[in-house]
């Protein structure tokens, strides 16, 4: 089942002499349960693409269809609701709230949506992420790897259709990087969680089911599906 369809996606910044074509007629689709790495040099358009997929930015033209909804047609309010309920975002810098503990950071998006957190899911995530002894700790009491685990848990609390990660290991050492990717793979395999990662790290790309290369705003290579996670 297609979880994501991108059709003739374009993104233009500025106009006239300052015009920049960040994305140029990008088209591809992703099946539910895929683990996809998007790679490319700095300025290639890969982060712009991820921001559009995450509903953080809007396209100049084209379609972005997630779970049957074309988010490019949504107004700002509906897009914010869709993003909160259907998309999990993980960044290089963890973006945790300093005055909230681990549990509070993980459940904040659910509370902002006016819902009660799923306590069973919270316990399950805390255990799988190795944070059981850290639930009352503040971000400044955690290591970088632990903070990124919290951000992963926060992103998964809403059962997202898509889990999007922008350089999730870029601020971590090699050992913590391996652990974070292993965790993302674990959720991908066990829960059929669709994962898209923007990365410069070739080791991460090699661990993906599929690698899409972007250069100068265009897809220049797509490895194709090497088989969905079982």
Q: How would you describe each model-predicted region?
A:
Residues 2-214:
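ABC family nucleotide-binding domain
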Residues 218-230:
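Conserved beta-strand-loop-alpha-helix hinge in the C-terminal portion
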């Amino acid at each position: 089942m297609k979880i994501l369809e991108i059709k003739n996606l374009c993104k233009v910044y500025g106009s006239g002499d300052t015009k920049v074509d960040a994305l140029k007629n990008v088209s591809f689709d992703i099946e539910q349960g895929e683990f996809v790495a998007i790679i490319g040099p700095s300025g290639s358009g890969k982060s712009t693409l991820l921001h559009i997929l995450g509903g953080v930015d809007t396209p100049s033209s084209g379609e972005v269809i997630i779970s049957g909804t074309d988010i490019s047609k949504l107004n700002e309010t509906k897009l914010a609701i869709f993003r909160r309920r259907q998309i999990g975002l993980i960044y290089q810098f963890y973006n945790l709230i300093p005055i909230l503990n681990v549990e509070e950071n993980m459940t904040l998006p659910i509370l902002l949506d006016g819902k009660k957190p799923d306590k069973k899911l919270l316990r399950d995530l805390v255990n799988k992420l190795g944070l059981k002894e850290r639930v009352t700790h503040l971000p400044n009491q955690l290591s970088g790897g632990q903070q990124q685990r919290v951000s992963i848990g926060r992103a998964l609390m809403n059962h997202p259709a898509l889990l999007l990660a922008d350089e999730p290991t870029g601020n971590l050492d090699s050992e913590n990087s391996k652990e974070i990717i292993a965790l993302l793979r674990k959720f991908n395999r066990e829960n059929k969680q669709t994962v898209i990662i923007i990365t410069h790290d070739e080791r991460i790309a090699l661990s993906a089911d599929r690698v899409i290369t972007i250069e100068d705003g265009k897809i220049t290579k797509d490895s194709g599906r090497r088989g969905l996670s079982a």
